């Protein structure tokens, strides 16, 4: 799958930031409640994403308000590809919603209308009946509202999804879905998460692809091994 390495590297940098990173700020405000902490984490992620790409005129930041929630999508104007990032947990929930209901008001589902006509690798979801006219119209209007003047500049939507464990990022993938969340293509981002490419390297050639090295399974095995060693060390100290 062709994709922009610079945008993906920026997504990974942004998604490394977690709730635990912002915890000290909230602890200074209150030791009782931390209302808004999750939203603040996402605000920081979007700021990191935008800061990483701000100097390159190739990219357009598209700010999308969704009620209490506001997200930032990145348009690669040279390739007409829109990049969105989310957690793997949320992506799974959104796909399941469409599988059950055949429709969703979630922003990703509306954006994926752009990918209508792409051929999925297999039938991951059961055959979904066509939307009725009202739902189809809602989806199209929602898409146009989100992308505004850029709607005709987007030919493909790519979803970066990221997995977390013990408060830190442990894996991820870049996914191309059809308009019903059926997988067309996917790239494992685990290697880039484990061994980040220097930003200067990807800026010189944003379309480079990383060479696969150690799989995420080995990373998890290493983590477990390290945790076992630490537990044994602590036990010996006691």
Annotate the PLM regions.
Residues 29-64:
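Short N-terminal edge-element motif at the start of the domain
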Residues 73-76, 113, 174:
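Short beta-strand element of the conserved SAM-dependent methyltransferase core
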Residues 85-87, 92-100:
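Basic, glycine-/proline-tolerant helical and adjacent loop/strand elements
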Residues 96-161:
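Catalytic cores of nucleic-acid endonucleases
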């Amino acid at each position: 799958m062709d994709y922009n390495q610079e945008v993906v590297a920026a997504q990974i940098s942004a998604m490394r930031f977690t709730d635990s990173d912002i915890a000290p700020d909230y602890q200074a405000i209150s030791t009782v409640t931390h209302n808004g902490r999750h939203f603040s984490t996402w605000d920081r992620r979007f700021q990191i994403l935008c800061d990483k790409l701000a100097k390159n005129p190739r990219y357009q930041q598209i700010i999308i308000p969704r009620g209490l929630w506001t997200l930032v999508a990145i348009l690669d104007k040279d390739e007409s590809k829109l990049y969105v990032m989310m957690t793997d947990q949320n992506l799974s929930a959104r796909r399941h919603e469409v599988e059950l209901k055949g429709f969703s008001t979630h922003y990703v589902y509306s954006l994926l209308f752009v990918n209508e006509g792409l051929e999925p690798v297999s039938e991951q979801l059961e055959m979904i009946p066509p939307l009725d006219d009202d739902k189809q119209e809602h989806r199209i209007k929602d898409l146009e509202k989100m992308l505004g003047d850029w709607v005709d500049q987007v030919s493909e939507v790519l979803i970066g999804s990221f997995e977390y464990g013990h408060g830190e990022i442990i894996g991820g993938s870049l996914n191309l879905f059809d308009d019903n969340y059926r997988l067309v293509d996917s790239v494992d981002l685990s290697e880039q998460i484990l061994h980040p490419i220097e930003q200067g390297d990807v800026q010189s050639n944003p379309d480079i692809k990383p060479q696969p090295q150690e799989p995420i399974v080995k990373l998890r095995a290493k983590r477990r091994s390290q945790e076992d060693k630490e537990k044994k060390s602590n036990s010996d100290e006691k």
